[in-house]
Amino acid sequence: MRQDLSLRLEQFKKQYVADEAVRSRIAEPPVKFIGDEIMELAVAALLQGENVLLSGGKATGKNILADNLAWLFRRPVYTVSFHVNTDSSTLIGTDTFTGGEVRLRRGPVALAAQYGGFCILDEINMAKNDAVAVLHSALDYRRLIDV
């Protein structure tokens, strides 16, 4: 990786240390991504505060790249595998009744936002409009989720 990117990445990791509560979600990937140019482009985009969309055929390394990026940034990973029944409550969270109280059980998107994690949205092309709509404000300039 280019030296300037490596330095900025190290600065990022020092400035944004993961919360102790989620460090178990930071795991070294079992497979190393091979593709320096793509890795550098993704790291540069993320360091600029951009989102990264990985598109391609099956078994082309998209998830491996995402896992490797999360490891490089030392961020917790939250993965959503979309299917026809994935809705907004699956992503953001839903109310549950626990111990005589109604509590919010946060979903992976809300947890990734709370802890500064990488949210890997796998097979997002399978998502219903309801599920995609809640992502808009999180992914655009607002960087905001109303829960």
Segments from the language model and where they lie:
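AAA+ P-loop NTPase catalytic core and its hallmark functional loops
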Residues: 1-147
